[in-house]
Amino acid sequence: MTSVRHYLQFSDLSPDEYHHLFERSRVLKRRQSAGELHRPLVGKVMSMVFEKNSTRTRVSFEAGMAQLGGHAMFLDTKSSQIGRGEPIEDTARVLSRMSDIIMIRTFEQGLVQRLAAHSRVPVINGLTNEYHPCQVLADIFTYVERHGSIKGKTVAWVGDGNNVCRTWLQAAAVLGFKLKVASPLGYELQTLDGRHYGSDVLEMTRDPARAVHGADIVTTDVFTSMGFEAEQAARREAFEGYQVTAELMKQAKPEALFMHCLPAHRGEEVAAEVIDGPQSVVWDEAENRMHVQKALIEYLLLGHRED
């Protein structure tokens, strides 16, 4: 019996598998744009478990499953027994008998790992406080479709060393690029996988200009992520000087791309003239969530495809 593959963090797949996913995403995006039908998942069902609200995650997975010929079911804490304390292990046992694949967006990475450990079908991490692999998968594809391989490039992260930043670090190690992180004291990137990352993979600084200098990608996120609202005032003060401005973008390469996972707060972590400017690819990132997730779902359920 073939073992079930899950996608719980970026390091779960190999460079060759990512190369396949990027090429497959390109094909699926082109087909969708041309109006071609590609429905290899007719009769397949995805259960989507949400403990954290979302716009892009829900819409991209629902639309993606529909385009592949399958169906996606939405479950949240109000409409399921999860909100009443049912163990996630029991939820996994039930959902994996009625679904072909599960996506979960929640708070704790440990919850996702427990779900996967008791599931008969693939589990995809739609977001946790620790990692956001589907977002970074889409971000890197957005770079790849414009400039080719990201290997040997430099990505600058300005702001909170959060789940997206932590996922960028895993991606740097897997795909061979460098991540430069600028964060204020107390909000630095904390690795959780026990790995030591050399200077060829990770550089940390307090200075945004140093991080952005010579970068191919400049990216950031909100200062206060979901679940940390009580810290909003303290965070706003701590992150003063960490806004991505047009002046800061001048430190990057002229062809550098600006990325943001959204939702964005103009005038806080990014200036309006940057996110709405010519170097910004945030809307392409959002769309590409759907395309890369389609490729990922197809790969986890059907394996390597060339059709």
Curated annotation (Swiss-Prot):
It holds the Pfam family OTCace_N. Pathway: Amino-acid biosynthesis; L-arginine biosynthesis; L-arginine from L-ornithine and carbamoyl phosphate: step 1/3. It is found in: Cytoplasm. GO terms for molecular function: amino acid binding; ornithine carbamoyltransferase activity. Its main location: cytoplasm. Keywords: Amino-acid biosynthesis, Arginine biosynthesis, Cytoplasm, Transferase. Reversibly catalyzes the transfer of the carbamoyl group from carbamoyl phosphate (CP) to the N(epsilon) atom of ornithine (ORN) to produce L-citrulline. This is Ornithine carbamoyltransferase. It comes from Chromobacterium violaceum (strain ATCC 12472 / DSM 30191 / JCM 1249 / CCUG 213 / NBRC 12614 / NCIMB 9131 / NCTC 9757 / MK). The lineage of its organism: Bacteria, Pseudomonadati, Pseudomonadota, Betaproteobacteria, Neisseriales. The gene is argF.
